[in-house]
Design a protein with these regions (language model features):
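Short acidic/polar N-terminal linker immediately downstream of export determinants
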Residues: 2-12, 19-77, 98-112, 283-298
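Right-handed parallel beta-helix
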Residues: 33-41, 81-160, 165-174, 183-192, ...
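Active-site alpha-helical segments that house and flank conserved acidic catalytic motifs
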Residues: 46-48, 121, 140, 231
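Beta-strand elements of well-folded, non-transmembrane domains
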Residues: 50-52, 72-74, 99, 125, ...
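Extended lipid/amphipathic-ligand handling interfaces
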Residues: 53, 145, 260-262
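Surface-exposed, acidic/Ser/Thr-rich flexible loop segments
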Residues: 58, 130-131, 263
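Short, surface-exposed interaction patches in beta-rich subdomains
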Residues: 61, 166-171, 175, 184-314
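Phosphate/pyrophosphate-binding betaalpha-module
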Residues: 180
Length: 314
């Protein structure tokens, strides 16, 4: 994926809560080995290689300086160190490891700075929180862990995660979301959303755009979607409330139910629904095999279920 301003690469090893709780193993016998409180001016970009550190960036359009607060705890003093350097308007932060062997450690870095900021973040484990950020393009590549986004504005918001949780709210931009195993919650998005998942749970609400979603195993819940696109659930249920049908609405399920409570006028659409084993319903019309309704519309809502039900009602 092409990245212009903001890139997040997170190769995480384990899932923790969204608070600061990242450990390389257990948190016994830890002592404070490093504390940082530094201020930097005229910073336009940052590169962070955080290792196991938890990372927070808090943007603010009313400030021009970057403040870095960091702490590092370990049961082996000298094993880890947070290094930082400013050069030509770029702030580099890196968690350094010395020698071999293992040890228990945890740490965090908390950054405040301008809302307009170029960021490049890498992390092996830990949690990432980004608040109040403006950019042309936002990308997050994750292995395993959690990410929380609030008030992010970008032409493209691209999130990929192998396993873990995504919580994103108050966003502007078209979002591409892909997660292998875990949960994703997106709310208050102005833009289109394309979401793909292998297993887990999707919850989307207040999306002012078109939503396409595909989930192999799990449940999808959607509320107040401006336009429904392609909804596919291989094994699980999809429940949609107070949302609008679109000119390209397609429903697919191998095993499970698709239930849609729509605010669209059903007479504005044709319907072509089929099921091998289950029931079909559009408004007051029902069928157990196939259900076709021709309202003379240029738009047709199509749906196929192998084993399960499709229900579309106002």
């Amino acid at each position: 994926m092409r990245l212009r301003q903001i890139k997040f690469q997170v190769l995480a090893l384990s899932i923790f809560g969204l608070g600061f709780a990242s450990l390389t193993s257990c948190e016994t016998n830890l002592e404070l080995v490093q504390s940082i409180d530094q201020e930097f001016s005229e910073i336009s970009s940052m590169e962070i290689d955080g290792g196991f550190l938890d990372i927070i960036y808090q943007g603010d359009q009313n400030i021009s300086v970057v403040n870095l607060i960091g702490t590092l705890e370990s049961n082996r003093p000298g094993k880890y160190e947070i290094e930082y350097q400013e050069e030509n308007g770029k702030l580099r932060i890196e968690l350094k490891k010395s020698g071999g062997g293992s040890g228990n450690a945890r740490g965090k870095i908390y950054l405040t700075g301008p809302a307009f900021m170029e960021l490049d973040i890498e992390s092996s484990s830990g949690n990432v929180q980004i608040h109040n950020l403006i950019s042309d393009e936002f990308e997050f590549d994750g292995g395993s862990g959690n990410i929380e986004l609030t008030n992010v504005s970008s032409n493209v918001i691209d999130l990929e995660l192998s396993s873990g949780n995504i919580v994103a709210s108050d966003l502007t931009g078209n979002m591409e979301l892909e997660i292998s195993s875990g949960n994703a919650s997106v709310s208050n998005l102005v833009g289109d959303l394309n979401a793909i998942g292998s297993s887990g749970r999707f919850k989307f609400s207040n999306i002012k755009g078109k939503v396409n979603t595909s989930l192999n195993s799990g449940n999808v819940t959607m509320t107040k979607i401006e336009e429904l696109g392609k909804l596919k659930v291989s094994s699980g249920n999809c429940e949609v409330v107070d949302s609008s049908l679109g000119e390209n609405t397609v429903l697919e399920s191998s095993s499970g139910n698709i239930t849609i409570n729509t605010n669209s006028n059903l007479n504005d659409f044709n319907f072509d629904l089929r099921t091998s084993s289950g029931n079909l319903r559009v408004g007051e019309s029902t069928s157990s095999g196939s259900l076709k309704i021709d309202n003379g519309s240029p738009y047709t809502v199509s749906g196929v279920v192998s084993s399960g039900n499709i229900q579309i009602r106002n």
